[in-house]
């Protein structure tokens, strides 16, 4: 079996198209496992959802931003924090406007209910007997600190305690990592969109498994970041300035 595993598309159909073309160029896959954050924040949430609808053999779980959009929750900074720290007001307004805009776009294509019902995690057993867990941030949560390169091993082990899996794949922090933490093989996929750091390519993995073993191939795909910025500006996205920072490698 061959599986493409993606996370953190964030409403970026340009990046998603590049990834899907790369998957096809690698010979295609049998399954798609998607680990959340599909629509916010980015210029084309409806386009992303339309493309995902066309994929065969898909498994979806939720990310924190999917929950924010579906249930009118919001990321940091919250209102009380802004009242105590007025310098955060611009960020607060920018993010809240962006999530409200995204909810409107998702509602317009009748996908809000779908988004609200996504499960927290996906568990399966690979053909070689490996117990797999896919979750957006960390076992038991779609939010929080997540997993980043350079984390203390004890902190990672604490988040993985009692996960009941041999192989755990996550996204959320937009930073790739591959670590053996005790008995658990931990993979952070990075992100399809809104890259953090200097490597602006879209990132995902292809998992190949049979009855004897499995392999994991990280994939890194170029796409046109300026085209994304132009798309944000053309539609007047309320979070255009914030999202463009990712596209320029400023986050």
Please report, for each region that a protein language model flagged, where it lies by residue:
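N-terminal active-site segment of His-dependent metallophosphoesterases
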Residues: 1-55, 240
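Anionic-ligand binding region
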Residues: 150-187
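Active-site-proximal segments of metal-dependent phosphoesterases and phosphodiesterases across multiple
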Residues: 82-83, 130-163, 195
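Acidic, His/Gly-rich catalytic cores of divalent-metal-dependent hydrolytic chemistry
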Residues: 167, 179-251
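Active-site neighborhood of divalent metal-dependent phosphoester bond hydrolases
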Residues: 49, 55-122, 150-159, 163-164
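Active-site neighborhood of phospho(di)ester-bond hydrolases with catalytic His/Asp-centered motifs
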Residues: 6-7, 32-37, 59-64, 135, ...
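Beta-strand-turn-beta hairpins that frame and shape the catalytic cleft
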Residues: 1-4, 124-133, 181-185, 214-215
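Active-site environment of divalent metal-dependent phosphoester hydrolases
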Residues: 10-15, 40-43, 65-70, 140, ...
């Amino acid at each position: 079996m061959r599986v493409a595993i993606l996370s953190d598309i964030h409403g970026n159909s340009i990046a998603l198209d590049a990834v899907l073309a790369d998957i096809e160029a690698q010979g295609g896959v049998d399954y798609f496992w998607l680990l959340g954050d599909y629509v916010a924040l980015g210029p084309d949430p409806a386009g992303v959802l339309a493309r995902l609808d066309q994929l065969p053999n898909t498994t979806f779980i939720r990310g924190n931003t999917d929950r924010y959009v579906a249930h009118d929750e919001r990321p940091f900074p919250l209102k009380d924090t802004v009242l105590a720290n007025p310098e955060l007001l611009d960020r607060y307004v920018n993010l809240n406007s962006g999530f409200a805009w995204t909810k409107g776009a998702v509602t317009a294509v009748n996908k809000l209910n779908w988004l609200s019902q996504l499960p927290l995690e996906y568990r399966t057993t690979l053909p070689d007997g490996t117990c797999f867990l896919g979750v957006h941030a960390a076992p038991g949560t779609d939010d929080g600190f997540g997993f980043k390169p350079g984390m203390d091993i004890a902190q990672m082990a604490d988040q993985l305690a009692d996960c009941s899996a041999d192989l755990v794949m996550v996204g959320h922090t937009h930073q790739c990592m591959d670590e053996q933490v005790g008995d658990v093989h931990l993979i952070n996929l990075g992100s399809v969109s809104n890259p953090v750091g200097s490597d602006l390519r879209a990132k995902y993995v292809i998992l190949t498994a049979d009855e004897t073993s499995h392999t994991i191939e990280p994939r890194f795909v170029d796409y046109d970041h300026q085209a994304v910025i132009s798309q944000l500006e053309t539609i007047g996205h309320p979070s255009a300035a914030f999202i463009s920072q990712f596209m320029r490698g400023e986050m």
